[in-house]
């Protein structure tokens, strides 16, 4: 069984209604990974990858490439890439807090912000231009969409 970026986002939306911090932390983390996978898929459709600025980690590298799009990208596409990179960077900061800084509080408000950022990433990835972001419906053999 495989999952999609949208599946992670759906889990986050459900957990948003939980009444305890551990679940908010899980939801914040999954929302980031939803955006990460959505962004990674979207980036593959660009004419050429951006400059990773020598970053080594896969997360930092993706964010850097999105923030520094290649000149082969037309202006609107480059602008969208930078927006996605900015939102993903903000989400990563919140995800690190949720996953690793257990001595810091994670609030429902922080989770709401994380979900807002995820919605912005998904919206930009689905915008006009370089195709669309990951489909919310996976294709089964024979081309029938799975709902």
Task: Describe each PLM feature range.
Residues 1-147:
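Terminal alpha-helical segments
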